[in-house]
Amino acid sequence: MSTYTPKAGDTTRTWYVIDATDVVLGRLAVEAAKLLRGKHKPTFTPNVDGGDFVIVINADKIALSGDKLNKKFAYRHSGYPGGLRKRSIGELLQKHPTRVVENAIVGMLPHNKLSRQVQKKLKVYAGPEHPHSAQQPVPFEIKQVAQ
């Protein structure tokens, strides 16, 4: 008897909604990455995209442990000499809270040919509203909440 290998059309995708209010960023990213890849399913195969859709709401209310709001930085470079720019995560959370959460989750995903396809299933919103109510997302509870 040969091993069962799921095909791309064999998987049923569920929509999950995660409320990021007072949840530590790293713990949220780990759980969201597991759902996006499909590692929680018994039919998980690393070379097939069998993961589910993930909606993250309240990204502006995410928690960071320690003093990371002021001491952790995001760097970017223009390509010109002296063009290195840095912003603290606290500044980024005020301007673009969805980018901070997206970058944390995408950083937990493998960087291979499937990564772009898996990233398209991630939807992040700063407030409590999202336009995906027609998909009937299931609430996903993260156990650890910031103190």
Swiss-Prot record:
GO CC annotation, single: cytosolic large ribosomal subunit
A GO BP entry: translation
Gene3D superfamilies associated with the record: Ribosomal protein L13
Keywords: Ribonucleoprotein, Ribosomal protein
UniProt-listed InterPro entries: Ribosomal_uL13, Ribosomal_uL13_bac-type, Ribosomal_uL13_CS, Ribosomal_uL13_sf
GO MF assignments: mRNA binding; structural constituent of ribosome
Family membership noted in the UniProt record: Belongs to the universal ribosomal protein uL13 family.
Function, as annotated: This protein is one of the early assembly proteins of the 50S ribosomal subunit, although it is not seen to bind rRNA by itself. It is important during the early stages of 50S assembly.
Quaternary assembly: Part of the 50S ribosomal subunit.
Name recorded for this polypeptide: Large ribosomal subunit protein uL13
Source organism per UniProt: Mycolicibacterium vanbaalenii (strain DSM 7251 / JCM 13017 / BCRC 16820 / KCTC 9966 / NRRL B-24157 / PYR-1)
Classification of source organism: Bacteria, Bacillati, Actinomycetota, Actinomycetes, Mycobacteriales
